[in-house]
């Protein structure tokens, strides 16, 4: 039962119809018997400042932040934590005695998903795409000791800007270019991360940017798309005896880290994962 003592968390963005975060977090709260709830807060860009101040005033514990607010919200928070400051975007806010702190758990989620199957330190990484998720992964993996990172994007200029930002903030010299460089780049990569929406529901049969013929045995292939769980890219990885990593892993681990930030407790990983898979299998 929701009462005046119930601790409130949630997610704010626009639109929000696709979010699986309420399912994942509410399953964890129920499993632990916590008087907490996670709800969606649709917030249009023009209402972002008012939303942050309103959540602060209402005593909300924290929220996830999604498109299109991850960068814009920086203007309205008091403190930004760790890697999030380098990335220049946050996906998690914690309200603590009137102070609003920002975190980027996409970054740690990407790292943990990869570390289930490989070591990032000393690895050669190829990232497809140059948007917010690509930024989070690139900065986190550079900080964790990747030997080299190549960023390829449909618009090479955007990849160049990300690489230059990494050089300015980390002193890390990433390579960059357009998709015409994919073939040569995959050959030398230990880890491939596709941050593009190619293959996302309902366009599940779209040809991936990298097919099995370009992959090699042992290549770690992380597709950030999680619906479907087994994308065409991951099926191609299996054909090539590469190592597929589903987007559900990053989704799960970014949620796990946000849960810890808000509650100070370790969530039941298996419960959160089962809740996600039940919904995705139903869809």
Curated annotation (Swiss-Prot):
Tell me which EC number(s) this protein carries. Answer: 1.1.1.25
Q: Which reaction does it catalyse?
A: shikimate + NADP(+) = 3-dehydroshikimate + NADPH + H(+)
The scientific name of the source species is Methanothermobacter thermautotrophicus (strain ATCC 29096 / DSM 1053 / JCM 10044 / NBRC 100330 / Delta H) (Methanobacterium thermoautotrophicum)
User: What InterPro entries is this protein classified in?
Assistant: Aminoacid_DH-like_N_sf, NAD(P)-bd_dom_sf, SDH_C, Shikimate_DH, Shikimate_DH-bd_N, Shikimate_DH_fam, Shikm_DH/Glu-tRNA_Rdtase
* Enzyme type, top EC level: oxidoreductase
An example GO biological process term is: aromatic amino acid family biosynthetic process
Annotated keywords = Amino-acid biosynthesis, Aromatic amino acid biosynthesis, NADP, Oxidoreductase
- Family to which the UniProt record says this protein belongs: Belongs to the shikimate dehydrogenase family.
The domain of life for this entry's organism is Archaea
Which residues bind shikimate per the record?
19-21, 66, 91, 106, 226
> HAMAP family from the entry?
Shikimate_DH_AroE
Q: Per its database record, what is this protein's job?
A: Involved in the biosynthesis of the chorismate, which leads to the biosynthesis of aromatic amino acids. Catalyzes the reversible NADPH linked reduction of 3-dehydroshikimate (DHSA) to yield shikimate (SA).
Q: In which pathway does it act?
A: Metabolic intermediate biosynthesis; chorismate biosynthesis; chorismate from D-erythrose 4-phosphate and phosphoenolpyruvate: step 4/7
Q: What protein is this chain from?
A: Shikimate dehydrogenase (NADP(+))
Q: Annotated Gene Ontology MF terms? A: NADP binding; shikimate 3-dehydrogenase (NADP+) activity
How does this protein assemble?
A: Homodimer.
What is annotated as the active site?
70 (proton acceptor)
Annotated binding of NADP(+), by residue:
129-133, 153-158, 224, 247
């Amino acid at each position: 039962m929701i009462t005046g003592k119930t601790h409130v968390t949630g997610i704010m963005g626009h639109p929000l119809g696709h979010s699986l975060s309420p399912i994942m977090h509410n399953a964890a709260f129920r499993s632990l018997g916590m008087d907490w709830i996670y709800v969606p807060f649709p917030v249009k860009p023009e209402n972002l400042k008012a939303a942050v101040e309103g959540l602060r005033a209402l005593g909300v514990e924290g929220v996830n932040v999604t498109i299109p607010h991850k960068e814009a919200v920086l203007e309205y928070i008091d403190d930004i934590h760790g890697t999030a400051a380098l990335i220049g975007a946050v996906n998690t806010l914690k309200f603590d005695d009137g102070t609003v702190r920002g975190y980027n758990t996409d970054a740690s989620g990407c790292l943990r998903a990869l570390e289930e199957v490989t070591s990032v330190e000393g690895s050669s990484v190829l990232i497809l795409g140059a948007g917010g998720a690509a930024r989070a992964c690139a900065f986190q993996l550079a900080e964790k000791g990747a030997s080299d990172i190549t960023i390829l994007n449909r618009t090479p200029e955007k990849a160049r800007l990300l690489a230059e930002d990494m050089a300015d903030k980390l002193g890390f010299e990433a390579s960059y270019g357009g998709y015409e460089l994919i073939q040569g780049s995959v050959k030398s990569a230990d880890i491939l991360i596709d941050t593009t929406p190619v293959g996302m529901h309902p366009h599940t049969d779209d040809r991936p940017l990298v097919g099995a013929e370009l992959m090699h045995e042992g290549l770690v292939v992380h597709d950030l798309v999680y619906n479907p769980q087994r994308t065409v890219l991951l099926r191609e990885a299996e054909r090539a005896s590469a190592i597929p990593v589903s987007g559900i892993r990053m989704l799960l681990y970014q949620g796990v880290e946000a849960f810890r930030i808000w509650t100070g407790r370790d969530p039941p990983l298996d419960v959160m994962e089962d809740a996600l898979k039940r919904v995705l299998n139903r869809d």
